[in-house]
């Protein structure tokens, strides 16, 4: 289309909010800190309950199933399983609300 209303590259490019294909080092740093913060909260709850001589099934299950930040591979810290992706992995920053959702466990072999 020519004239005053012709297409420009940004207008014909699709989504306005583009997501880069890889996370920046600052996003990775914040992700590691979030994982450590959750680990600290779980440890604090576990210690407080241990002082009282009590246990909670949810905390025990979390400890049994979820790895800590130090135990996780970088692949698991920064990517998640997605069956629609070519290599079955996509960056965790492409997940909606990725800063609020705990994504620590992926299917075995992926």
Swiss-Prot record:
Keywords: Mitochondrion, Ribonucleoprotein, Ribosomal protein. GO terms for molecular function: structural constituent of ribosome. One of its GO terms (cellular component) is mitochondrial large ribosomal subunit. The keyword Zinc does not apply. It is found in: Mitochondrion. Component of the mitochondrial ribosome (mitoribosome), a dedicated translation machinery responsible for the synthesis of mitochondrial genome-encoded proteins, including at least some of the essential transmembrane subunits of the mitochondrial respiratory chain. The mitoribosomes are attached to the mitochondrial inner membrane and translation products are cotranslationally integrated into the membrane. This is Large ribosomal subunit protein mL60. It comes from Neurospora crassa (strain ATCC 24698 / 74-OR23-1A / CBS 708.71 / DSM 1257 / FGSC 987). The lineage of its organism: Eukaryota, Fungi, Dikarya, Ascomycota, Pezizomycotina. The gene is mrpl31.
């Amino acid at each position: 289309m020519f004239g005053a209303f012709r297409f420009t590259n940004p207008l014909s490019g699709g989504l306005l909010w583009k997501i880069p294909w890889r996370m920046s080092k600052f996003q990775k740093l914040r992700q590691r800190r979030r994982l450590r913060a959750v680990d600290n909260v779980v440890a604090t709850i576990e210690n407080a309950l241990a002082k009282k001589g009590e246990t909670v099934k949810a905390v025990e299950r979390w400890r049994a199933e979820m790895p800590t930040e130090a135990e996780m591979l970088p692949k698991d810290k920064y990517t998640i399983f997605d069956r629609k992706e070519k290599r079955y992995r996509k960056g965790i920053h492409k997940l909606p609300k990725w800063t609020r959702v705990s994504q620590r466990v992926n299917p075995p072999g992926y």
